[in-house]
């Protein structure tokens, strides 16, 4: 990587922030939390929660503490509903922020600290965790009040932190096999670092994206027929929007939750403005089965008798690719299985491909100067 970006490339080597010692520490800490908590509140916004949420909401283990999300809204209605969920539950909270000036996590952390102190008294500090950078005001709070402090890597931007304390602790609390996740990332790292350009899937994806961009396609839709990817889309959208969207350049990332949204945006994709190209995530291994049993009542769906919903879903997927590819470019990324290992592979693949895509486009993949514009006016209005 370029020397000027070196302070943002701590994610390139997965081992740097997810070696055996770090994983062991996180597993032991998560085990302690799981033994004492009904719910774990993840306070964070954007890169501080998207990676963890994408895996937790897809793979959370039955019986694991509920993961409740805070610090991602300023809506009093949403915040009150979140606080209502805490009633009667044994709680731990983790405030995750690289920049503790961000309003959403900062304000949520205050009301949740106050709740913890009211609920647990002098024992509250044992249940409060903060994940921040060394020397930050968040670390100062931990030192002063006895909260547990975890390091947010200074050399990793928020949207690249899946394989660090930021993403791994909440996942481990939810019962995710973080070793399998990290191994998936390591295996993908080895693959995309060692393969030649003509065989390198990350390089091919980055090049194709830029080729379509140059041909006038300004929107990329990441689509799948698996609802478990719902929050992974949010992570992916932030990754590409913040990394590429600058200097009046960039491909606008959106998601297609199929088959449901074939009945809404499907019309635009098929017949609307030709501005979209599509990338499909296709899970190749069947994890579950549900057979449509015959029914003596005539409902005109007898053609489904004996068919597995896996087969039906795949038929819808293949038909969609066939139809859409007649109008727009369609790529497919095959995902071996919906499990922690393959989520790890996806994280590293997209991070590395995004980095390459930004290099081709000629923008810095690791800054986000545009997000400061609204903050100036907001802080002025609030009297900061």
What is each PLM-predicted segment?
Residues 48-51, 76-78, 101-103, 136-139, ...:
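Flexible loop/turn segments at secondary-structure boundaries
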Residues 1-31, 295-304:
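Extended, charge-enriched "interface" segments that sit outside catalytic cores
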Residues 119-278, 367-384:
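Active-site phosphate/pyrophosphate-binding segments
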Residues 343-384:
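Generic C-terminus detector
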Residues 27-195:
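Glycine-rich phosphate-binding loops that contact phosphosugars or nucleotide phosphates
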Residues 254-339:
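Helicase-primase coupling helices
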Residues 57-66, 115, 239-250, 323-327:
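Short helix-loop-beta junction
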Residues 17-34, 199-211:
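A short, well-structured juxtamembrane/interface segment
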């Amino acid at each position: 990587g370029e020397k000027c970006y070196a302070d943002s490339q701590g994610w390139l080597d997965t081992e740097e922030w997810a070696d055996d010692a770090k994983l062991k520490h996180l597993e032991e800490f998560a085990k302690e939390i799981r033994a004492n908590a009904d719910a774990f509140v993840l306070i964070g916004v954007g890169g501080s929660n998207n990676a963890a949420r994408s895996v937790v909401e897809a793979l959370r283990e039955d019986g694991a503490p509920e993961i409740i999300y805070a610090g991602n809204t300023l809506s009093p209605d949403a915040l009150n509903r979140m606080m209502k969920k805490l009633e009667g539950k044994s709680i731990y909270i983790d405030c995750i922020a690289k920049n503790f000036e961000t309003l959403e996590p900062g304000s949520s952390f205050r009301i949740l600290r106050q709740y913890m102190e009211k609920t647990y008294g002098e024992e509250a500090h044992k249940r409060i965790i903060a994940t921040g950078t060394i020397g930050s005001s968040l670390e100062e709070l931990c030192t002063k009040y006895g909260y547990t402090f975890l390091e947010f890597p200074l050399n990793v931007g928020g949207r690249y932190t899946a394989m660090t304390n930021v993403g791994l602790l909440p996942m481990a609390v939810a019962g995710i096999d973080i070793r399998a996740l990290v191994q998936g990332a390591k295996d993908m790292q080895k693959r995309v670092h060692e393969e030649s350009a003509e065989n390198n899937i990350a390089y091919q994806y980055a090049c194709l994206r830029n080729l379509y961009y140059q041909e006038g396609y300004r929107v990329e839709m990441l689509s799948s027929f698996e609802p478990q990817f719902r929050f992974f889309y949010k992570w992916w959208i932030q990754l590409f929007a913040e990394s590429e969207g600058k200097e009046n350049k960039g491909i606008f990332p959106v998601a297609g939750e199929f088959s449901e949204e074939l009945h809404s945006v499907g019309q635009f994709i098929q017949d609307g403005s030709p501005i979209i190209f599509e990338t499909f995530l296709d899970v190749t291994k069947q994890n579950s089965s549900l057979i449509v049993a015959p029914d003596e009542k005539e409902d005109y769906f007898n053609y489904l008798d004996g068919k597995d919903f896996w087969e039906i879903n795949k038929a819808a997927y293949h038909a969609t690719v066939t139809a859409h590819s007649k109008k727009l470019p369609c790529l497919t990324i095959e995902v071996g299985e919906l499990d922690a290992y393959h989520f790890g592979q996806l994280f590293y693949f997209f991070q590395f491909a995004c980095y390459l895509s930004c290099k081709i486009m000629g923008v810095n993949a690791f800054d986000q100067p545009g997000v400061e514009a609204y903050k100036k006016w907001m802080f002025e209005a609030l009297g900061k």
